[in-house]
UniProtKB/Swiss-Prot annotation:
The lineage of its organism: Bacteria, Pseudomonadati, Pseudomonadota, Gammaproteobacteria, Enterobacterales. One of its GO terms (cellular component) is cytoplasm. HAMAP family: His_ammonia_lyase. This is Histidine ammonia-lyase. It is found in: Cytoplasm. Keywords: Cytoplasm, Histidine metabolism, Lyase. SUPFAM superfamilies: L-aspartase-like. The modification 2,3-didehydroalanine (Ser) is found at residue 144. GO terms for biological process: L-histidine catabolic process to glutamate and formamide; L-histidine catabolic process to glutamate and formate. Its EC number is 4.3.1.3. The gene is hutH. It catalyses: L-histidine = trans-urocanate + NH4(+). There is a cross-link at residues 143-145 (5-imidazolinone (Ala-Gly)). One of its GO terms (molecular function) is histidine ammonia-lyase activity.
Amino acid sequence: MKQLTIYPGKLTLDELRQVYLQPVKITLDSQIFPAIERSVECVNAILAENRTAYGINTGFGLLASTRIEEDNLEKLQRSLVVSHAAGVGKALDDNMTRLIMVLKINSLSRGYSGIRLAVIQALIALVNAEIYPHIPCKGSVGASGDLAPLAHMSLLLLGEGQARYQGEWLPAKEALAKANLQPITLAAKEGLALLNGTQVSTAFALRGLFEAEDLLAAAIVCGSLSVEAALGSRKPFDARVHVVRGQQGQIDVAALYRHVLEESSELSDSHINCPKVQDPYSLRCQPQVMGACLTQLRHAADVILTEANAVSDNPLVFAEQGEVISGGNFHAEPVAMASDNLALVLAEIGALSERRIALLMDSHMSQLPPFLVENGGVNSGFMIAQVTAAALASENKALAHPASVDSLPTSANQEDHVSMAPAAGRRLWEMAENTRGILAIEWLSACQGIDFRNGLKSSPILEEARVILRAKVDYYDQDRFFAPDIDAAVKLLAEQHLSSLLPSGQILQRKNNR
């Protein structure tokens, strides 16, 4: 099992991707322990001095003015967790649940939440034992924290609800017992600290970010294959074109296209003296469009990584000053807007890919047989595959509508503006699936087109991309059941067979090579 030491507030995107992809063994940097203890001491001092502080000895939301007596404080925290566990929908998978839990551990360990180290260690023990709480995927509006899903996460600590252990859903107490763990009792402030926060919104956005990064890389390879299949020019990828514009994302993407295409190939040499002056935009403007996508991807990554390391609790405990301050760090507007940007990225990757597919189908544009098949008429070839790509691209356009501009007041108008960040992040998963389907069809189409070019070879990287596909999907000499071939290409894309052809870490890394 992968080992990960959490230095609170310093998680990297690579570490978060590892957490998402596979189980991890968590340890917490012991240097943060004193800060955690000081925040608890501050909470205890407020109680000892009989001061009123929101979330410590008051009700919540519109009931914040209700003072809670000391003998009810433990009950208050338990009641908060069980009452707020009101989510609906399918349970999140282990990968998403683990990522949420690690994000919560990271945030609580910063030492501003007034929660005991023992509670944080109890969460760590769950991650290390691979016991995952039942968290429904819907029920948060991304303001006042992701209350419902984080309440479902916290139920497991109390021995309530359900948990998945070794692939089986069990009552929480039974799952804990199988791993030799015990339920805990929450002290003042601790239930609220567990529930308040943007960790679910951030985890949803992180998955979308990881998907978008992989798909952008795959799109560069697919787009390069289409350039070769359509006998397109390499000149639009010349570094000089992009340097004079100065858009860094465009500069960096053009460099990746040049890396994939190389200076020339047998295919490019075959039409070096052709009369064609300019290629259609879907071929020629790939660096401009994909470069803009990369710029948005990088911005979203910066925002989401900042939030992954943020303290998004409320109220916050500033132990050195002995103060507890109510604020609004639980409002996930930055994450919602970042997710909206990622939605644009995914929609545009798919939209441009679909246009290249359509170009390859059109014999007047590509100089290839209509619908990429011999004996057209008897055979329909890729005709309906392009229709499928168009359907997916169109669906993504609807899904790309910004969620962050929506808001519905909650909690009797106390929480009168919300971010809708969870919905903004969750729809990215469906958009990524759609975009992967479009790219799969382009991969199939471009390889079929190259197969019509009299055995001429492309660049080494693109030849490898063809070999990978042809190991699973044969050349189309006549019509056959098409869907399994798309599924095979989708599976190869999901396994990162194309994105891995680019140099490691080259998508989000900035070059500064103007």
